[in-house]
Amino acid sequence: MKPSVYDFTLKELSQLLKPSFRAKQLYLWLYAKYKTSFKDMQNNFSKDFIASLEQEFVLRTIEITHVSHSVDGSKKYLFKSLKDNHTFEAVFLKMKDKKIDEETNAILEGEKYTVCVSCQIGCQVGCSFCFTQKGGFVRNLKASEIIQQALLIKEDNNLPIEKALNIVFMGMGEPLNNLDEVCKAIEIFNTGMQISPKRITISTSGVADKIPILAEKNLGVQLAISLHAVDDKTRSSLIPLNKKYNIECVLNEVKKWPLEQRKRVMFEYLLIKNLNDSLNCAKKLLKLLNGIKSKVNLILFNPHEGSKFERPSLESARMFADFLNSKGLLCTIRESKALDIEAACGQLREKKL
């Protein structure tokens, strides 16, 4: 199968296409005008050039096969690879957004949009609380397949070209186990879809030896660590990878992560009833993160079929958060979106068509 044109960075296309300025023109057609056929690019491309593009590349390599709609406005997308028919999911999230008008000081209300993308079909990490791992690991997604998730979702929701998206690598898969394709996708998000790296978050279960490699690339993205426990015994029961990279090992690498002024590393902490949601756990978490510029994002466990875990009460989550905030550690509780369509954290999976 010919490569997808979405797999190429602007620099790579500039080296492949002659004259090289054609690369920028092609990028505009792809990412600013959503063109899905080379024949639709005839305004400034000759028939011969279009024929050469058709000979070298394909465009779309995935398609939307189903969309689930949540009462909160979120949507879960089931994508199918046109190459091997494997499926994977991504989520479109709508959030309320408030801004202050600099001239009038009036509060302006609007919406901000986040796409939670997948980077693998299945996952190798095998977190016990996550539904994705039940299907095992199939393969890595190409950069083009990651990019097309955001493109197709933006197109399906009729969002203006200029409307910025937030991208979070929190769907199916471990981003650091597909680092090359993830980094290429981030570059294309930036130069193609004009998404600032500051709007992109990479969430990892703690592949400690890949964190410095990501840091060296200096992409300017937000780093999020799926911590979920304050001791190695509990964390290993939740995240088997912890047996290889324990909490101390992960935190040592996080301490070296380059941070801009006023930026913090995000630690995601999944609250599970009677396992890691006590005030004593909050105290241990405070001690663990001492000296790290960090913020904690609490996630209430999202139930799924066959899970042995239970969701804690919102009251216990608030007590946990209030304690950390009172001690100066910024802590928020993530609003669970799309629970009614099984699209919340830890609920995505491959589906057989």
UniProtKB/Swiss-Prot annotation:
The EC code for this enzyme is 2.1.1.192
Any one GO biological process: rRNA base methylation
GO cellular component terms given for this protein: cytoplasm
Q: List the disulfide bonds.
A: C116-C345
The record's catalysed reaction(s) read: adenosine(2503) in 23S rRNA + 2 reduced [2Fe-2S]-[ferredoxin] + 2 S-adenosyl-L-methionine = 2-methyladenosine(2503) in 23S rRNA + 5'-deoxyadenosine + L-methionine + 2 oxidized [2Fe-2S]-[ferredoxin] + S-adenosyl-L-homocysteine; adenosine(37) in tRNA + 2 reduced [2Fe-2S]-[ferredoxin] + 2 S-adenosyl-L-methionine = 2-methyladenosine(37) in tRNA + 5'-deoxyadenosine + L-methionine + 2 oxidized [2Fe-2S]-[ferredoxin] + S-adenosyl-L-homocysteine
Per its UniProt record, what PROSITE patterns does this chain match?
RADICAL_SAM
Binding positions (S-adenosyl-L-methionine): G173, E174, S203, S226, L227, H228, N302
Keywords, in A-Z order: 4Fe-4S, Cytoplasm, Disulfide bond, Iron, Iron-sulfur, Metal-binding, Methyltransferase, rRNA processing, S-adenosyl-L-methionine, Transferase, tRNA processing
Identify the cofactor(s): [4Fe-4S] cluster
Cofactor note from UniProt?
A: Binds 1 [4Fe-4S] cluster. The cluster is coordinated with 3 cysteines and an exchangeable S-adenosyl-L-methionine.
Enzyme category, top tier: transferase
Q: Where is the active site?
A: E89 (proton acceptor), C345 (s-methylcysteine intermediate)
Family, according to the entry, reads as follows: Belongs to the radical SAM superfamily. RlmN family.
PANTHER family assigned to the protein according to its UniProt record, in alphabetical order: 23S RRNA METHYLTRANSFERASE, RADICAL SAM CORE DOMAIN-CONTAINING PROTEIN
Role description: Specifically methylates position 2 of adenine 2503 in 23S rRNA and position 2 of adenine 37 in tRNAs. m2A2503 modification seems to play a crucial role in the proofreading step occurring at the peptidyl transferase center and thus would serve to optimize ribosomal fidelity.
What is this protein's record name? Answer: Dual-specificity RNA methyltransferase RlmN
Originating species: Helicobacter acinonychis (strain Sheeba)
Gene name, per UniProt, is rlmN
